[in-house]
Amino acid sequence: MEDSAIASTLASDTYGLDIVDTNIQDMKNNTTRFLIMSKELQQERNENLSYLTSCIFEVKSVPSALYKALGGFATNGVNLTKLESFIVDGDFNKAQFYIDLDGHAEDQSVKGALEELSFYTEKLKVLGVYPKHSYRNN
């Protein structure tokens, strides 16, 4: 085998690929997320859908910075579904955080939460907005 990929059976059917193995996940409900990148916001708000928004931010290096940064989500009623930390450039005094939150970046509550977040961050970037899959509603 010269080249290989982890892909869906749909990719196999579409591109005529051979399936070497199936169900290779290490956890029963494992999921893989794929991204479509764009310089402009592409996901217009549809009132009939629920959304997730993904962001990345770097807190200021001061006591309680993360606590204060996250407070805006609580006061605006925005649920965080994921929070991951990363060390920036090997500097243990700087942390960058990835978050997923319930809601669309254009929702008033999300706008308010992100505005409050920006007061306590060095950098803040909305990575994307996408429809929430129905399995997340359980």
Annotate each PLM feature.
Residues 1-138:
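Domain-level signature for soluble enzymes in the chorismate/prephenate branch of the shikimate pathway
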